[in-house]
């Protein structure tokens, strides 16, 4: 865990953002405003699905509590979130196990707030057909080809399998977040 004091750049991934309804975030610019007013620094977002980059000297758990509370109180959305240091995202991109023969836009990343190795990963030892899963140091890597008849490897399935909150992003979104 991070110690309070050093200002670090963090990436926050919101889980369950919807275009309308209970978990909608009407404008990402409003989210930037409320997080900035709360004292977070250099706050920015990427696409409407709930990707936030900010700087803070707070520990990750404190950031998580504050961001969750602010979104719930100011916007009304009760969203799960995963927060990682930007350096973790750099490692995730560098450690991508899928080579050039894989379609880049079909590679997905599953993130968990704690260490991925703390999950009961032995539960993944089943046949997923054309879909592939690789265990990384910081995440799970999924390859979900368009030709797969029924996509089993998705966030809902994995959350039920492990009994924890997870979130998924495409690898190209993770890479884009590093440039923001």
Model-derived regions: residue spans:
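N-terminal amphipathic/basic-hydrophobic helices that include classical n-h-c signal peptides
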Residues: 1-7
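Surface-exposed, charge/polar-rich loops and edge strands
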Residues: 7-49, 53-180
